[in-house]
Amino acid sequence: MAGARPPPGLLPLLAPLLLPLLLPAGCWALEETLMDTKWVTSELAWTSHPESGWEEVSGYDEAMNPIRTYQVCNVRESSQNNWLRTGFIWRREVQRVYVELKFTVRDCNSIPNIPGSCKETFNLFYYEADSDVASASSPFWMENPYVKVDTIAPDESFSRLDAGRVNTKVRSFGPLSKAGFYLAFQDQGACMSLISVRAFYKKCASTTAGFALFPETLTGAEPTSLVIAPGTCIANAVEVSVPLKLYCNGDGEWMVPVGACTCATGHEPAAKESQCRACPPGSYKAKQGEGPCLPCPPNSRTTSPAASICTCHNNFYRADSDSADSACTTVPSPPRGVISNVNETSLILEWSEPRDLGGRDDLLYNVICKKCRGSSGAGGPATCSRCDDNVEFVPRQLGLTERRVHISHLLAHTRYTFEVQAVNGVSGKSPLPPRYAAVNITTNQAAPSEVPTLHLHSSSGSSLTLSWAPPERPNGVILDYEMKYFEKSKGIASTVTSQKNSVQLDGLQPDARYVVQVRARTVAGYGQYSHPAEFETTSERGSGAQQLQEQLPLIVGSTVAGFVFMVVVVVIALVCLRKQRHGPDAEYTEKLQQYIAPGMKVYIDPFTYEDPNEAVREFAKEIDVSCVKIEEVIGAGEFGEVCRGRLKLPGRREVFVAIKTLKVGYTERQRRDFLSEASIMGQFDHPNIIRLEGVVTKSRPVMILTEFMENCALDSFLRLNDGQFTVIQLVGMLRGIAAGMKYLSEMNYVHRDLAARNILVNSNLVCKVSDFGLSRFLEDDPSDPTYTSSLGGKIPIRWTAPEAIAYRKFTSASDVWSYGIVMWEVMSYGERPYWDMSNQDVINAVEQDYRLPPPMDCPTALHQLMLDCWVRDRNLRPKFSQIVNTLDKLIRNAASLKVTASAPSGMSQPLLDRTVPDYTTFTTVGDWLDAIKMGRYKESFVGAGFASFDLVAQMTAEDLLRIGVTLAGHQKKILCSIQDMRLQMNQTLPVQV
């Protein structure tokens, strides 16, 4: 009504002091102001409609600075529609704008004699334009062309004259596309004062992170937008992974770093990792990375900054296998105290270690043999040359680790010089030959070496004709040969002498086997007998039958081999024909059938109905809107607001309910998805499952009513009450959640989003599973790294089993994994699983069998149950029925909950590595190989005799190669596990008494 004014006494309440509100800014977030009325002292001159609505007044803040405000209080009249529009605000190329409103609202109940149209809310709108074109009548004062941002409700209203309280609300809108915009405020019957309005936008400040520089970046068009900011490495840094970028989120905060830089060689981090500083002279850094510069190793130096390696001093070297951080070393001094012991044509050399090893521990010895000719006296110098290859060194000539060598097969009456060299890993780097100690010896007269081989020239029923080669080392003139022979079955030996290297043995028995040996003789005596050789005389009937008998095994073997080959060819042909008859789709011709036991209640997916409304009618109760009273907004959901209200059904007492509303302007798909949660909840009836009261679908807005849970979500409830509950109380909460999940699993329902944030708590600390809105189906798009569901939500990586992330295999077993994470959340009082690790780091850690450590004061039995839930093989995880039984036993046996892990909690404790099995838990070597996923080698281990853990613990890489483990990766895995086994054995050795 024209000329209407607020009731007497209300105006003073509409101009309270402006209280400063200090909000912690987001990490690295910047706010740039587009408009702020707080600092305006002259008239704002905004446009109001009608003129009797909003009124501009002056006031003072707490510092007595003048401020301009707008107020309205036409509560005595119904059907109010008062509009207020700001001046034109330039957008500055931003896509999303934030509005901070400071206002006061009077409680309608404190104003006497007012109609029921009094409100405590107002609406925020905006209108885009390319220039300042608005007038008093254009655009029309209504929603559309104006775009509604939100309905603004106060946190606190006031009722007394001296108790005005300032509310601060921040809302955002976008995306914006035109040059600027207007803000508009609609009052529909409130008594309020608009104290200040600030329009601003957010951006991520320029930052240096991970040795990379990222520029100042505007936020995106949506709160969930991620804007890519390309980065560049700082000076003296290099890229270690590409592309190098950082994401700016909608709150102006940097997140999700991709790629990284690190300090180059010769440079170390400085100024809190914002600089890479050159290493000063006398220090170096060999590898790129975040490590510091190090002093030069012994016997090395640098003379300039930014050195990546220190050069060795003169006569000092590094081996090719030495790292840059190794000390420079030198060659060893000669061996000491060489002793020779000659025995005819062989000798033994022994020596002592050099005085100076050159600073290395890879000392080896070489023995150089030289044969000398000529006089050793005054008649002239001797001429020496390298020995022949037939000289034998035991254990070897080069690369000796022992300080003793046996040398044989030398020539008799010959002078030799032996040089014993000391070498190490840098001897090849030195321009000088290895240092050595020499010894001269002369061999004595010696008997000839043994005859190498005997040959059969002919045989008969009574004789054998044999020949042989002369000894390799006759050591003089061969005088004759002596042959020893005897019939193998009798063992009585006879001898015969020959001047030549052949002989015929006569008077032998027919068809008999004889053992023959021969030796040579010089003036020094007989040499050793040759190795025994066996020869056989023929039978008197002739050799034809004997030849046939000798060839019979060959004939039989060839026949059998031919038959086996034919059988293999026939089998292969049959297999190929069978594969041709069975097409590639044969494996899909049979389908699995699910049989449900009589009387068992089974969950029915509402998305299987042709008409989703039919599922709602079948499983949810329709409630008349007159029975519902909305009291206040307590949150916002994906589809609309979440409110607290009351439900009064005929014949029943009034109860508090939580009300989810469907926002205005919904699509049919949004309505279907919104009501699908009611169709799901309506099928459940369990004290630990959130109860559906009903739905309102025949009026607007569409609503879902559930029981009201006073303590809201479990995670925030635990954080607010950190350390306030006993272990028994926490286990009781976990038991309730497990009981609810047991009920769901028995109904064949997979939750897929089990987390503490989706568990609601009532005033009696009863926990109930909620949030059944996650889509049951995931889009099969393997190129999408976020694994988004059909509702657009992302899979909660930190709570999801690895098979569900990798293959989207959601089962009750994957819910068990999530339950283990919920257990960890409860025992840590709402701490974030995996702390500040990125989602990709979490995936990698879980894939490498790392698990969360026990929270502070967590009973060992509970953490073991968590680890059981996090077993990689989903078939080995406990069922929810087993989890409930385990928790019941723990509750009955409270003493078991007093045993806690001694490790610290929180981020200071690393993730637990679950890959090292305790060998004492296995009964056989085969079980151990199965546990480390090397079961394919069980037969190889047993066949080679490694059937006990004591023998396995002594195995080397050569042993693995010998039994058939040829793959380098498998060798490494088995050897690492053997090393762990040795450590465990050392820790559990019994004490001898």
Swiss-Prot record:
The chain crosses the membrane at residues 555-575. The modification Phosphotyrosine is found at residue 609. GO terms for cellular component: dendrite; plasma membrane. Residues 1-29 form the signal peptide. Residues 576-993 are cytoplasmic. InterPro entries: Eph_TM, EphB3_rcpt_lig-bd, Ephrin_rcpt_lig-bd_dom, Ephrin_rcpt_TKs, FN3_dom, FN3_sf, Galactose-bd-like_sf, Ig-like_fold. The gene is Ephb3. Residues 920-984 form the SAM domain. Pfam families: EphA2_TM, Ephrin_lbd, Ephrin_rec_like, fn3, PK_Tyr_Ser-Thr, SAM_1. ATP binds at residues 634-642, 660. It is found in: Cell membrane; Cell projection, Dendrite. Its EC number is 2.7.10.1. GO terms for molecular function: ATP binding; axon guidance receptor activity; ephrin receptor activity; transmembrane-ephrin receptor activity. This is Ephrin type-B receptor 3. Residues 331-446, 447-540 form the Fibronectin type-III domain. Disulfide bonds join 73-191. Disruption phenotype: Mice are viable and fertile and show no obvious abnormal behavior. The corpus callosum, the main axon tract connecting the left and right cerebral hemispheres, is not formed in a significant fraction of newborns. This is associated with defects in guidance of callosal axons across the midline.
